[in-house]
C-alpha cells in the first residue's frame, strides 16, 4: 500500500497553492491485520465461516482503509457480530485477531462518527463565507484533523473546496480589503451568481418504513435471535434485550417475561410486514442446502425424508433463487403463483446476495426423496444448480428432496 506522507500544518504566510488535499489517512496496523485475517478466510473458501458475506467484508475493509467511514465501520462491526453469533468455534480460534480488528474499528470508525458530525455541523459552505484571514486557519484545522488518522470524504471535499475558493477569489478579496492589485493587473470579476434553476443537492434521508428497517436489521444480524426464539431454542437473554432496546421494542433493561414476549412479537411482526412490502416475483423454483447428519437432528431429518409429510417452518425460511449451497441435503422447493416468498434485493443489509425469504409458519409438502444410491439420483443431480465455489465438495450431497411450497 502506498504510504502517504503527513501534511505539515500551515504556519506563517505559506501560499495556499502549496497546500495539498489529503487523500487517505494513514492506515491502522490493527486494521491491516484484520484485513489479512479475512483475506485468508476468503482464500480458504466461504465454507470456512459458512457465510458468503465474507467477501463483502473484505471489500468493506479495503474501502475503510482508503477512506474511513462511520457507516462502513458499522457494517463491518455487524458482520463480525454475525460470525460471533453463528460460528463461535471458528471465531474463538481467532479471538485475538478479532479483538484487534474491533480495536482498529474503534480507532477509526468511532472517531470517524465523532469527527463527521462536527464537520457536517460547520460544513464547507459556512467556512467559504468566512473572510480571507480565516481561510488558512480553517484549512489548517481540516488538515490537522485528517492527520489524526480519520480522513473522511467530507473532510477531503471541504478542504478541496476551500483551496479552490481561495485560488479563484484571492485577488477579489484583496481588492475589497483596499489593497492594490497584484502586478498592476485589474482584479478578476466576482464569481458568477449561481443559477437559481439549478437543483440543490440535499443530504440523503432514509425514507424506509419502520418495517423495512426492521427487515434490513434482520438480514444483518437479527435473524439468529428471531429464528432461535421462534423455534424454541436457547438464546442469550441479555443480548436479546439489548437488541430490542436498540430497536425501540423495549423501554426497560429489566422487562417482565410478558413485556419481553410482547417486544419480540412486535419485532417479528415488523419484519414480516417489511417482507410483505417487497415486490412479488414469478420464480418457480428455489434451493436450500441443509446439514442433517447430526444425531440431534434425527427427528428433523425424519420429517423431511417422509414423502407426503407436511412441514410447518416455525421461523423465517431463507432460500436461494439461483444456486444451492453444497451440504448433505439439498432441498429443491417448487413454487406456485401466489407464494409468500420475496427477494430481499436492496432491502438486504449485505448487497449482492440473492436471497428469497419466506415468513414464519410457511408450510411445505415433501413430494419426493432421492438418496445417492437411488437410480434417479444422478439425473436429478446433474440438473441441480449449485454454488460454483471451488472448495465445495459435491460428494457430501447424500440426498435431494423435492418440496412443494403450499400457499396457505
From Swiss-Prot:
GO terms for cellular component: extracellular region. It catalyses: L-arginyl-[protein] + NAD(+) = N(omega)-(ADP-D-ribosyl)-L-arginyl-[protein] + nicotinamide + H(+). Its EC number is 2.4.2.31. It is an enzyme of class 2 (transferase). Keywords: Glycosyltransferase, NAD, NADP, Nucleotide-binding, Nucleotidyltransferase, Toxin, Transferase, Virulence. SUPFAM superfamilies: ADP-ribosylation. Disulfide bonds: none annotated. Residues 184-193 have a biased composition (Pro residues). Changing residue 353 to A: 20% growth in yeast, 13000-fold reduction in mART activity. No change in NAD(+) affinity. InterPro entries: ADP-ribosyltransferase. Residues 168-196 are annotated as: Disordered. Pfam families: ADPrib_exo_Tox. Residues 190-393 form the TR mART core domain. One of its GO terms (molecular function) is toxin activity. Mono-ADP-ribosylates chicken skeletal alpha-actin and human non-skeletal beta- and gamma-actin. Mono-ADP-ribosylates 'Arg-177' of yeast actin, blocking its ability to polymerize. Does not possess NAD(+)-glycohydrolase activity, unlike most mART enzymes. Upon expression in S.cerevisiae almost completely inhibits growth. In the C-terminal section; belongs to the SpvB family. This is Photox toxin.
Amino acid at each position: 500500500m502506498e504510504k502517504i506522507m503527513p501534511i505539515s500544518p500551515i504556519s506563517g504566510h505559506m501560499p495556499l497553492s502549496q497546500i495539498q488535499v489529503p487523500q487517505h489517512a494513514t492506515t491502522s496496523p490493527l486494521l491491516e491485520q484484520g484485513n489479512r485475517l479475512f483475506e485468508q478466510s476468503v482464500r480458504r473458501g466461504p465454507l470456512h465461516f459458512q457465510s458468503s458475506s465474507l467477501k463483502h467484508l473484505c471489500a468493506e475493509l479495503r474501502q475503510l482503509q482508503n477512506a474511513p467511514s462511520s457507516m462502513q465501520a458499522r457494517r463491518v462491526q455487524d458482520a463480525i457480530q454475525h460470525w460471533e453469533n453463528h460460528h463461535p468455534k471458528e471465531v474463538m480460534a481467532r479471538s485475538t485477531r478479532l479483538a484487534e480488528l474491533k480495536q482498529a474499528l474503534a480507532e477509526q470508525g468511532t472517531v470517524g462518527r465523532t469527527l463527521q458530525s462536527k464537520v457536517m455541523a460547520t460544513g464547507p459552505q459556512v467556512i467559504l463565507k468566512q473572510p480571507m484571514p480565516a481561510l488558512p486557519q480553517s484549512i489548517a484545522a481540516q488538515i490537522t484533523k485528517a492527520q489524526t488518522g480519520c480522513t473522511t470524504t467530507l473532510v477531503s471535499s471541504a478542504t478541496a473546496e476551500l483551496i479552490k475558493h481561495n485560488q479563484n477569489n484571492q485577488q477579489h478579496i484583496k481588492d475589497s480589503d483596499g489593497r492594490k492589485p497584484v502586478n498592476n493587473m485589474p482584479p478578476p470579476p466576482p464569481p458568477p451568481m449561481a443559477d437559481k434553476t439549478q437543483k440543490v443537492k440535499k443530504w440523503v434521508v432514509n425514507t424506509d418504513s419502520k418495517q423495512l428497517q426492521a427487515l434490513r436489521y434482520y438480514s444483518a444480524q437479527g435473524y439468529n435471535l428471531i429464528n432461535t426464539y421462534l423455534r424454541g431454542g436457547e438464546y442469550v437473554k441479555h443480548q436479546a434485550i439489548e437488541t430490542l432496546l436498540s430497536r425501540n421494542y423495549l423501554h426497560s433493561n429489566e422487562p417482565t417475561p410478558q413485556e419481553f414476549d410482547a417486544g419480540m412479537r412486535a419485532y417479528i411482526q415488523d419484519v414480516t410486514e417489511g417482507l410483505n412490502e417487497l415486490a412479488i416475483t414469478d420464480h418457480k423454483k428455489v434451493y436450500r442446502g441443509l446439514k442433517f447428519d447430526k444425531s440431534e437432528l434425527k427427528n428433523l431429518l425424519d420429517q423431511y425424508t417422509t414423502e407426503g409429510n407436511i412441514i410447518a417452518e416455525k421461523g423465517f425460511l431463507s432460500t436461494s433463487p439461483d444456486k444451492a449451497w453444497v451440504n448433505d441435503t439439498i432441498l429443491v422447493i417448487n413454487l406456485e403463483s401466489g407464494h409468500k416468498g420475496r427477494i430481499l434485493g436492496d432491502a438486504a443489509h449485505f448487497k449482492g446476495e440473492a436471497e428469497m425469504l419466506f415468513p414464519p409458519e410457511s408450510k411445505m409438502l415433501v413430494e419426493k426423496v432421492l438418496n445417492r444410491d437411488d437410480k434417479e439420483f444422478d439425473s436429478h443431480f446433474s440438473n441441480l444448480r449449485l454454488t460454483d465455489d471451488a472448495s465445495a465438495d459435491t460428494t457430501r450431497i447424500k440426498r435431494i428432496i423435492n418440496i412443494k411450497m403450499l400457499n396457505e
